[in-house]
Design a protein with these regions (language model features):
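Conserved structural motif at the start of ABC-family nucleotide-binding domains
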Residues: 6-8, 21-23
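ABC ATPase NBD Q-loop/coupling interface
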Residues: 63-79, 143
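Q-loop/switch helix immediately C-terminal to the Walker
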Residues: 90, 96-110, 123
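ABC ATPase C-loop
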Residues: 159-160
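Walker B catalytic motif
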Residues: 171-172, 179
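Helical segment within the ABC ATPase nucleotide-binding domain
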Residues: 181-194
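H-loop (His-switch) and adjacent beta-strand-loop-beta switch element
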Residues: 213-220
Length: 220
């Protein structure tokens, strides 16, 4: 394995006083793609939420190390600033906030500085073109009226724009047709090529994996 980016040690996680994860151990190196597989109900998504710091998922013991730092107690926004990204299985609709405004705000939070609007929009248009997304989606309210495939493309677009160190994709290929899976796979490959970031792909299917190079697979 290359230099460790993510290291999870003996992680126990509870949701509403019910323990979901019972001592999980996992390590992901820099510039690696790992797959987390298993049937529904085994805690795959719970692990993703725990890594990103969702407060509904309580770590009762164990640790999460990211880039050599213990982030177990860090709030979700601080983990995002450090370069952890989660693509949701069912992305929420956000009326009143356009896709473009959401991504720009997230980038400014990450960098701590204002972005030049023209430069941002140019990069956004170029990235959308790579994913075969119509430019009009940038000015639509985030995920409002989007099809399942469009929501997943919007998540991949955010990943490419934010360039995290670690991207966690939770069932990104779930419910998609062949063309949408192909586009998502292309986005994942572009992420690896452009950023050399690491990926943790959570899935119970093998469709998206057929087009990707995977360094390691884990079963829950």
């Amino acid at each position: 394995m290359k230099k460790e980016l993510l290291k999870i040690q003996d992680l126990h996680v509870c949701v509403e006083d019910k323990e979901i994860l019972h001592g999980v151990n996992l390590a992901v190196g820099q510039d690696e793609t790992h797959v987390l597989m298993g049937p529904n109900g085994t805690g795959k998504s719970t692990l993703g939420y725990a890594i990103t710091g969702n407060p509904a998922y309580s770590v009762t013991s164990g640790s999460i190390l990211f880039d050599g730092e213990d982030i177990t107690a860090l709030p979700v926004n601080e983990r995002a600033k450090k370069g952890i990204f989660l693509s949701f299985q069912n992305p929420l609709e956000v009326p009143g906030v356009t896709l473009s405004a959401f991504i720009r705000s997230a980038l400014e939070q990450k960098t701590g500085s204002r972005l030049r609007l023209w430069d941002f929009k140019k990069r956004l248009r170029e990235t959308m073109a790579l994913l075969d997304m119509d430019e009009s989606y940038a000015e639509r309210d985030l995920n409002v009226g989007f099809s399942g495939g469009e929501k997943k493309k919007a998540e991949i677009l955010q990943m490419l724009m934010l360039e995290p160190k670690l991207a966690i994709l939770d069932e990104t290929d779930s419910g998609l047709d062949v063309d949408a899976v192909r586009t998502v796979s292309k986005g994942v490959r572009l992420f690896r090529e452009r950023t050399h970031g690491s990926l943790l792909i959570i899935t119970h299917s093998t469709r998206i994996l057929e087009a990707l190079h995977v360094d390691a697979a884990h079963v829950m």
